[in-house]
Amino acid sequence: MKKLLLICSFYLHAELMAQADNEIQVYASPTIQHKWTIFELHSNFTFKGSKLLANAKDAKWTNKTLEITHGFAKNFEIGFYTFTAFSPNGKFQYLGNQIRPRITVPESWKWKLGASLSLEFGFFRPNDTTDFAWQGELRLIIDKTTGNWYFSFNPNIDFVLTGDDKGAGISPQFKTVYTINKKVGLGFEYYGSLGYFRHILPGNLQEHLIGPVIDLYVHPMWEVNAGLLFGLTENSNQRVLKILLGRRRGK
């Protein structure tokens, strides 16, 4: 999560808008099993950035995020993120850390929809020439499986607590996939960022990305997701490749 911090810095720091998010993922509602841990590596490469960039080469960032999540109770987990990136010139940069507790509605409640709530908080900077800002994200996760179809909606609220870009805004996300033979899921994902609640940005300065994704259910201990996202507005990154690899370890 860093869309709000970057999108609201546009006029002063246009080059900061070049890179993709460190973590591009629509969440499912279940938490990891009690006493289990999952290690996930998020790799995102921006092939083509915002059309408003003066230099197209500024967009070619590779973002790497290590996410480690442990189940501390049956319906409660805590995740920890380490954000890093390689700039267009190949320089490695450390960008920050965040922690994310999450709770989910127990299956015993027999809700018709899956639901969970997470609060992510920590410090982040867009690159190593900028200051860290304390920021976070409140993420409501609502999902549903019906037959071979899966749907998930994350109406996220992003917030920045320090620096020149203090405020809160909304970054909605959506995913749907159709599972084939319980081995492959094909569908699409959408990611948006509208700006602050107090100042919704003009349409061309908002971020809206959508694209095809694939989920591979190769083994219960592994998580594999990949997608190619396309920008729908001038200020969106125009082409972003996202890859997620996860490995679970049980008690």
Located regions from the model:
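Transmembrane beta-barrel domains of Gram-negative outer membranes and organellar outer membranes
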Residues: 18-251
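Bacterial Sec-dependent N-terminal signal peptides
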Residues: 1-22
